[in-house]
Amino acid sequence: MKKLLLSAALTAFGLLATPALAQQVNAYCSTNQTWCEMAASEFTKATGIKVVQTHLGTGEALARLKAEAANPKTDLWWGGTGDPFLAAAEEKLLDAYRPAYTKDLYDWSVRQYDMSGNFVGAFYTSFIGMGWNEETLGKKKLAAPKCWADLTDPKYKGEIEMAHPGSSGGAYTIVAGLIQLMGEDAAFEYMKKLHKNITSYTKSSQAQAKNVARGEAGIGISFLFGFEEERQAGFKSVRATAPCEGTAYELGGIALIKGARNGELAKKYYDWLMSPVGQGIGAKANSLQNPANKTFKQDAKIPTMDGVKLINYDFKKYGASAERKRILEKWEKEVNSLPR
């Protein structure tokens, strides 16, 4: 019966394997690497279409798409925070695509299509939090942070890690979120103080949860689901919370690339990723974002968003290429250039 149901679901999305010459779709994936790999493997098993996929942070993927604009090397980009996707749409690097099954998606996902002119879909959502290792902080007699304001306390000097907003879409979400929460001037003053306590800015926002779990960082600022993933993987001293003042969130992006060589195959991979089968891969890969497709029961391991104080994040403004560039340049000049 399960095989029949799976077959029916794939048929509805036009995804059953059919005899063909060697078919290949090229993709950039910016979410959890295990999820990227599992999705590609399962899609190939289901359809017979080979996936050649490169794992890149969203900032890196955007830079590569710009460099390859005259001769695109990939067909599809999926996963990772949506702001860089919106910047790519603005720079005419993407092809518009509005799936026929938007009725199966949550409203926040459909709004991403509407806002972007159908150039960017919302694959999942998740929110920014702070995670810590109780054991690591306990050895140093440090209390766990609960609010953004706590993180600038000098007692946390050398204890906090986050990603670099130039290479990580998640870190850019943090910076843009602080600006919207506090106002730009106050946010930059805050980030200057926070900078003094940062031990390192990593390339990807996926590093913080792992480094906190392994005691390599006492506190990490990233998407909260990552810390929950580590806790469920056996690192029971990992804890996390959403900042008490309010926090930003992401809409994970998915988009077709303008000028793609394998556009029709890319649509098949896209549709499969948005189907219940494809969306369910995330939790199987222990990647616990909230999926966009509402037609199936999401895994109980996925953190609830109940009680989290979310800001009214302006995706259109902060996803704009010029605004993103301005903020990143200002952050480099006024924050990252300071000594720690």
Where are these regions (language model features)?
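Bacterial N-terminal signal peptides that target proteins for export
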Residues: 1-8
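Sec/Tat signal peptide C-region and signal peptidase I cleavage site
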Residues: 16-22
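Early extracytoplasmic/lumenal segment of secretory-pathway proteins
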Residues: 23-87
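Extracytoplasmic ligand-binding site segments that recognize negatively charged/polar headgroups
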Residues: 30, 34-37, 73-209, 213-216
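A ligand-binding cleft/hinge motif common to bilobed small-molecule-binding domains
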Residues: 83-87, 213, 217-237, 286
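Periplasmic-binding protein-like
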Residues: 190-195, 201-202, 234-258, 294
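Mature extracytoplasmic/periplasmic domains
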Residues: 252, 257-315
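Conserved C-terminal helix/tail region of periplasmic/extracytoplasmic solute-binding proteins
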Residues: 313-340
